[in-house]
């Protein structure tokens, strides 16, 4: 719940299940969207770098990526980069650690594993 006071400053109030209310510090709330977008941008840069490494390792020139590479979603909702229909990189679905207030994103470089 927000209250507007005379100087156009917003005050945030928490309401408990029993109906009591109290003021809360709005600082952690302000700018939360910027934090989320910054995190998405950082993750995108990591993914872009990992995809580029996979292309380089598999000797796929940039002009051939559209024909040879594909991003697919597996049965567990993970994103998989395939090159020539073979999986080379798994970007796992994010794990949300609510108690720590963060998400963990993992990936696996299949192209580095020995394939027999």
Curated annotation (Swiss-Prot):
This is SPbeta prophage-derived uncharacterized protein YoqA. It comes from the Bacteria. The gene is yoqA.
